[in-house]
Amino acid sequence: MIDSAFVVLPHDLLWGMPLSALPDDAPQWAVDTLLAGQPVVVRRQAMPAGQVAVGLRGRGREQRYAASMWLTNVYRRVTPEQLIDCPSEHIQDWPALRALRQVRPVMDALERVWGVGGSAGFELASGIAALNQDSDLDLILRTPAPFSRRCAAELVEALAASVCRVDVQLQLDQGAVALREWARPAGRVLLKTASGARLVSDPWHLAEVCA
C-alpha cells in the first residue's frame, strides 16, 4: 500500500480500488472492471483528505463511471510521464501509437514535462485494449509556468502533421486548459479546476482564477 499522504494528479492511473468502494447501484460492467484488476483514472475533483476522485472505464465510450477511493488502498500508480516510451513491439500498432512516436521529438524539444493520457495511456499502462483505428492521441503537458499563446499556436501547428488527431491539455497548478483554445490569438479560455470550470483570460493569473 502507498502512504495516504502521497499526491496524485489528474490522469494518473491507480491500482487497488476495492469492490467495497463502489456504491450498490454501480453497473455490472464497473464491478467486472475491478474484478479484472483494471486500473482507475484520477479525476479532477476536490475530495476529503485521504480520498481521491477516480473514473472507471469499460469497453465502450459510453461506459464511464465516476467514483472515489481511499489512497491507502492504492498499491500501484502510473503517471502520464512514465508512458512516453511507446514500445515498437506493441501488439497492435494503432495510429495513436504511431503518432506518439512521431511527435515525441516535438514534445521533448519543449523542455517541459509531458506524458500520455486517454485511451493510449490506459492501454500502454495496463496492456488492456482501449485503442482503435479512430482513436485520438491525448497528451498532457505540465505548464506550472506560463506558456505563451504564440508557443501554443506553434505547437498546434507542429502536431498537425501527425498521423492522427493529437489533443493536448496544459496542466497548470490550478487546473487544465486545452492547448487549442489557448493557441487562439485572444479571448477567454475554459480552465478546468477541482471545484469546477470557468472562463478566464489568463489561466496563470492566480488573482483572476481565485476571484
Swiss-Prot record:
Instruction: Name the reaction it catalyses.
Output: apo-[malonate decarboxylase ACP] + 2'-(5''-triphospho-alpha-D-ribosyl)-3'-dephospho-CoA = holo-[malonate decarboxylase ACP] + diphosphate
Keyword Transferase on entry: yes
Q: Which GO terms describe its molecular function?
A: nucleotidyltransferase activity
Keyword check for Protease: no
Pfam families named in the record: MdcG (PF10620), MdcG_N (PF20866)
Sorted UniProt keywords = Nucleotidyltransferase, Transferase
The EC number(s) given in the record are 2.7.7.66
Active-site positions, per UniProt?
D136, D138
Superkingdom: Bacteria
Q: Which family does it belong to?
A: Belongs to the MdcG family.
What's this protein's function? Answer: Transfers 2'-(5-triphosphoribosyl)-3'-dephosphocoenzyme-A to the apo-[acyl-carrier-protein] of the malonate decarboxylase to yield holo-[acyl-carrier-protein].
**NCBIfam families assigned:** malonate_mdcG (TIGR03135), PRK01293.1 (NF002332)
User: What protein am I looking at?
Assistant: Phosphoribosyl-dephospho-CoA transferase
Q: Give me the gene this protein comes from.
A: mdcG
